[in-house]
Design a protein with these regions (language model features):
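Local sequence-structure signature of Cys/Sec-based thiol-disulfide redox active-site neighborhoods
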Residues: 1-22
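Charged, low-complexity surface patches
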Residues: 5-8, 27, 42
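Flexible, glycine-rich phosphate/dinucleotide-binding loops
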Residues: 10, 35, 91
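Stable alpha-helical elements in mature extracytoplasmic
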Residues: 15, 33, 65-69
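Conserved helix-turn-beta segment immediately C-terminal to the redox Cys motif
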Residues: 16-36
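Thiol/selenol-based redox catalytic cores and closely related redox-interacting motifs
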Residues: 40-117
Length: 117
């Protein structure tokens, strides 16, 4: 897994540590801007946070938990990536908020949990 974050990002390291504790191998990169990574991964601008990751060809926005990454690895769903829709502080460990799967058209679909109404 590759994680791209900017100098101003204060949360990527804690998310990476949580994933490493779950057995994931993670490389971290600190480019000047995330635009090239996001363009390559086709990340919708509406989901952009302070870091983005690439896992098995999918983009990951937000602090997606290990369970979501394992599900991606097992199911290989049609789509370009997933995004965690809850604040980072709630996303450590289990799934406290919904995770959406983004399709080829950039449309988000409920994937894990239910979006808050």
């Amino acid at each position: 897994m590759n994680v791209y974050f900017t100098h101003s990002c204060r949360c990527a390291h804690s998310w990476v540590q949580a994933l490493q504790a779950e057995g994931f191998v993670v490389k971290m990169f600190e480019p000047e801007t995330l635009k090239p990574a996001r363009a390559a991964l086709h990340t919708p601008a509406s989901l952009n946070g302070c870091h983005v990751a690439e896992f098995m060809g999918y983009f990951i926005e937000g602090h997606a938990p290990a369970v979501a990454l394992r599900r991606l690895a097992t199911e290989h769903p049609a789509g370009t990536g997933i995004a965690m829709l809850s604040p980072a502080s709630k996303a450590e460990g289990g799934v406290d908020g919904p995770v959406v799967l983004v399709d080829q058209e950039g449309i988000s679909h409920a994937w894990i949990g239910e979006p808050q109404r």
